[in-house]
Amino acid sequence: MPRTLGNGFIHVSKLDACIEVDRPLDTYSPGSLTDIEKTFGKHVAGLIDDGACLQLGIGGIPDAVLDFLHDRKDIGIHTEMFSDGLLELMDRGVVTGDRKTFHPGKIIAGFTIGSEKLYDYIHDNALIEFHPSDYVNDPFNIARNDNMVAINSALQVDLTGQVCADSIGAYIYSGFGGQVDFMRGAAMSKGGIPVTAMPATAVGGEVSRIVPMLNEGAGVVTSRADVHYVVTEYGVAQLHGKCVRDRAKALVEIAAPQFQESLLRAAHKRRLFGPLI
């Protein structure tokens, strides 16, 4: 078990019982990036400047973004989850935290899962601090980082900008985690950028993730009032401050080409563009 620094200690006097366990820690090994992941990773990376402070999760989307940041400088990290994808950027000197305006020079995280290498890396590492989620995920603490870029995934986005990230229809797929906290914190940050990133399709290209309306019973994690940037392998849609008509147009443009015509007709039917002609 790695010994992590920060605010994660409990004095032994607070424990009623202590049981030693010697089984190996659970690990997670990142897979190879797909061409689609590499493409939208490049689009997201284009929104990240030198000195930005990042929040990322785990899996193909964050790893794809990190793969295109090797030429950046003084990147900071304030994130709910600390994962393997960050290790290479730290070794390359890309992640320094030197320009952070909140906990400068430190990586702030809430929890971690990854490889044995990751666990060895964070053990007694004074550059990495773990804190309770009510501190890490506090939108006002997140906003204290200038140029905060929050990158979160989605299952569906409708043509008005509502983001579903936790359910497939009425069936719960995962927890919503800290997505709303970080999207709002990044929005309040000076120079901050909230990003929703996802592949344009699912089920091998048979289903569009950009939809006229969310599936019946689907949960809205990031509301249309909180959404800013939506990214797929087909481009970047900037939605914040735009009317519903312009949002729908921007989202159709980053949908998979085989679904664009049907999405346009659905937008007309919903009167997002005006009457159906």
Which residue ranges define each predicted feature?
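Conserved phosphate- and dinucleotide-binding cores of soluble alpha/beta proteins
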Residues: 1-277
